[in-house]
């Protein structure tokens, strides 16, 4: 054993008062940094520590140099004594109990990691890299490697990080409070990556709360476990610069966008019924989407959530890809794989509300921190969830940073923002007296408006390749217009009116459709008021609504014919496209998150025909500029037949500057119509580029033999065409 150095005369007390020892042992001391660790008085230094189970403790420098033997002040593990140091520095202890010996690096001997500017920007709400500061990060600090933990809990009396590394003992790593920001932090030396942890919080009233998961955790345990996991920084080698450059430099409104909406846990499953990993999904889902011609995959929420039947919409970990499909690196590999073949990835993102699971954000520090305290603003009656407090800068910053995190760290191409209408209206799903008017007496949630505007400004300002899409079900104006023009700033908005009206029409027996012609024509009155996405989403095939094929009237042949005609009608209609998985091959059953899609149906001609049709629709839409370049501008659409309600026929022209127009003609009755006269913009031969009644799609094979002839009949250019039953055809001039 080394000979102890001569210790300087101590000019400060190295002992600890009985009250403070009691508080440390009880876990009620709010600032152990003031007591434990290394402290200086003049030229003298003392070290104090709390090491449960130790009978003897020796203090050392980080490189192992002896600096003093500490005296036991309490049998439960409190030690203190003078140490021989030239300056304040971190120390390590060698603890002994009987024959057992172990080393402990003192977390209280390290200085803070965060600085005053972090406090300032965090409090102001303008910190745009909180995800690099908050949560758990492996760093090297003052000569030691460990995990830096940081969490916002301004009203807590005490916050500790607990986990595998300290036996889940909240007395061991009590965090340092930063009064200027309300953030608690601690550097935990020698703690490795991969450990499970939570925060133990004593609320403002002194009551110990249930253990909380880390709001900024980048990885979580697999349900039913709920702890956060200290994750490494992503080390993905990205190979997608060409993909990102394309979307940075193009007007997304004038690009073909056809989105395949996917629930990652039920698209396909293993033979034993378990979920695929990200790498397994990549090997099958990516080539499938490439073959099908989709431009984007939109995932239902993949952020961590405890309850499978919530489909991810009740998330408890906004920064953590769910552990159901493996580690976060797997998701990064999946996105990279998509980008290498030109497929974009969109995340269904839920900033409107969060669940009240005890390990989540609810009453995080014993107060309504992330939510409103008044349930008239802070509780969502439809979903029994808490509503974010959009008037609090730290909460808005948490959400905006999360959007930036997904764009930067995972290279996501878009965010589909869920439940925007519930955010915009204070009286959403509330009766009279159950809501609080805004400062002007109205029902608009002005705080949510400002949040959404700020979100879009930040996203488009830092990641111009990303698009934001609003699921907004009302007529709120200018959802997809720029903020500087008074809009919310979204890139696109779901056209819920199109979905509702067209499905209402399609469910009707064809004999009655002539009485509801306006259900399909009305939508063109507002089709260009926003930049629309036409959604046939998961919402339309759950909760007893039946699948899309099951909604169609008639016998099986008519059901398939109706759906084929409807799909081509939609792909020819102005707006970007979205289709939920399984509907591309007309799955009969409603979607269930608990099992795979019914892929066995593809062995049957009608289902395989539907899949081939959707594939051809995608490639036709993408290859014909007239069908996509003016999706969001009225100049790209011209009615050809709008008022033939008697025959339930609709026809229009899709156009783009300098490009061949495409005529879209739909017959929504089972009547085979020959010699139907239609006006066209130019004489000559027009080629039938798509016919949903083709035999290859499962149809009857009726049509125009591939071409029609338009003739100039004294100023009016018309052609006589054959309209197959329950079918849509598309025509394009040959020259």
Swiss-Prot record:
It is an enzyme of class 2 (transferase). It catalyses: Transfers a segment of a (1->4)-alpha-D-glucan chain to a primary hydroxy group in a similar glucan chain. GO terms for cellular component: cytosol. Keywords: Carbohydrate metabolism, Glycogen biosynthesis, Glycogen metabolism, Glycosyltransferase, Transferase. It comes from the Bacteria. One of its GO terms (biological process) is glycogen biosynthetic process. GO terms for molecular function: 1,4-alpha-glucan branching enzyme activity; cation binding; hydrolase activity, hydrolyzing O-glycosyl compounds. The keyword Glycosyltransferase applies. The active site is at 418 (nucleophile), 471 (proton donor). Pathway: Glycan biosynthesis; glycogen biosynthesis. SMART domains: Aamy. Its EC number is 2.4.1.18. It holds the Pfam family GlgB_N. Belongs to the glycosyl hydrolase 13 family. GlgB subfamily. Catalyzes the formation of the alpha-1,6-glucosidic linkages in glycogen by scission of a 1,4-alpha-linked oligosaccharide from growing alpha-1,4-glucan chains and the subsequent attachment of the oligosaccharide to the alpha-1,6 position. Monomer. This is 1,4-alpha-glucan branching enzyme GlgB 1. The lineage of its organism: Bacteria, Pseudomonadati, Pseudomonadota, Alphaproteobacteria, Hyphomicrobiales.
């Amino acid at each position: 054993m080394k000979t102890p150095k001569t210790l300087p005369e101590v000019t400060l007390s190295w002992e600890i008062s009985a009250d403070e020892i009691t508080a440390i042992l009880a876990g009620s001391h709010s600032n152990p940094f003031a007591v434990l660790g290394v402290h200086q008085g003049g030229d003298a230094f003392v070290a104090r520590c709390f090491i449960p189970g130790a009978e003897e403790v020796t203090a050392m420098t980080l490189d192992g140099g002896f600096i003093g033997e500490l005296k036991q002040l309490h049998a439960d593990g409190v030690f203190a004594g003078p140490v021989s140091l030239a300056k304040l520095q971190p120390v390590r202890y060698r603890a002994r109990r009987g024959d057992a010996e172990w080393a402990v690096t003192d977390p209280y001997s390290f200085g803070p990691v965060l600085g005053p500017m972090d406090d300032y920007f965090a409090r102001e709400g303008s910190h745009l890299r909180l995800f690099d500061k908050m949560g758990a990060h492996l760093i090297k600090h003052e000569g030691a490697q460990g995990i830096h933990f940081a969490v916002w809990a301004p009203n807590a009396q005490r916050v500790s990080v607990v986990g595998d590394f300290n036996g889940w003992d909240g007395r061991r790593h009590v965090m340092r409070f930063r009064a200027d920001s309300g953030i608690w932090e601690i550097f935990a030396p020698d703690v490795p990556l991969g450990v499970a942890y939570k925060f133990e919080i004593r609320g403002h009233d002194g009551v110990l709360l249930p253990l909380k998961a880390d709001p900024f955790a980048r990885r979580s345990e697999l349900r039913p476990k709920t702890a956060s996991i200290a994750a490494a920084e992503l080390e993905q080698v990205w190979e997608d610069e060409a993909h990102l450059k394309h979307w940075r430099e193009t007007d997304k409104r004038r690009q073909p966008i056809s989105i395949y909406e996917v629930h990652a846990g039920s698209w396909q499953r293993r033979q034993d019924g378990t979920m695929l990993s990200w790498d397994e999904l990549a090997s099958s889902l990516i080539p499938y989407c490439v073959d099908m011609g989709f431009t984007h995959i939109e995932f239902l929420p993949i952020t961590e959530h405890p309850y499978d039947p919530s489909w991810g919409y009740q998330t408890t970990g906004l920064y953590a890809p769910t552990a159901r499909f493996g580690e976060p690196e797997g998701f990064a590999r999946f996105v990279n794989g998509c980008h290498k073949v030109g497929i974009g990835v969109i995340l269904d993102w839920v900033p409107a509300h969060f669940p009240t699971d005890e390990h989540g954000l609810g009453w995080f520090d014993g107060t309504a921190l992330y939510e409103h305290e008044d349930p008239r603003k802070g509780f969502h009656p439809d979903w029994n969830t808490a509503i974010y407090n959009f008037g609090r800068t730290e909460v808005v910053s948490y959400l905006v940073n999360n959007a930036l995190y997904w764009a930067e760290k995972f290279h996501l191409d878009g965010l589909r923002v869920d439940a925007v209408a519930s955010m915009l209206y204070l009286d959403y799903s509330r009766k009279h007296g159950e809501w609080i008017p805004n400062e002007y007496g109205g029902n608009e949630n002005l705080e949510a408006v400002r949040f959404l505007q700020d979100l879009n400004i930040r996203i488009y300002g830092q990641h111009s390749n990303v698009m934001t899409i609003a699921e907004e079900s009302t007529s709120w104006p200018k959802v997809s217009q720029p903020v500087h023009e008074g809009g919310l700033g979204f890139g696109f908005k779901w056209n819920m009116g199109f979905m509702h009206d067209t499905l209402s029409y399609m469910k009707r027996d064809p004999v009655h459709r002539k009485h509801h012609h306006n259900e399909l024509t009305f939508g063109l009155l507002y089709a260009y008021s926003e930049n629309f996405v036409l959604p046939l989403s998961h919402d339309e095939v759950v909760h007893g609504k039946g699948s899309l094929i099951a909604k169609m009237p008639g016998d099986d042949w008519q059901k398939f014919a109706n759906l084929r005609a409807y799909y081509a009608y939609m792909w020819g209609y102005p707006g970007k496209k979205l289709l939920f998985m399984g509907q591309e091959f007309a799955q009969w059953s409603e979607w269930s998150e608990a099992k795979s899609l019914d892929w066995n149906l593809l062995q049957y001609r009608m289902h395989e025909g539907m899949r081939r049709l959707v594939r051809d629709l995608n490639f036709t839409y993408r290859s014909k500029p007239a069908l996509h370049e003016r999706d969001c501008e009225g100049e790209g659409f011209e009615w050809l037949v709008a008022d033939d309600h008697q025959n339930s026929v609709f026809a229009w022209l899709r156009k783009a500057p300098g490009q061949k127009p495409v005529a879209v003609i739909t017959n929504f009755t089972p009547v085979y119509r020959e010699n139907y006269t239609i006006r066209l913009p130019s004489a000559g031969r027009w080629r039938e580029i798509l016919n949903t009644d083709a035999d290859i799609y499962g149809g009857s094979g009726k049509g125009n033999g591939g071409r029609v002839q338009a003739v100039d009949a004294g100023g009016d250019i018309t052609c006589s065409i054959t309209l197959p039953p329950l079918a849509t055809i598309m025509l394009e001039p040959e020259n």
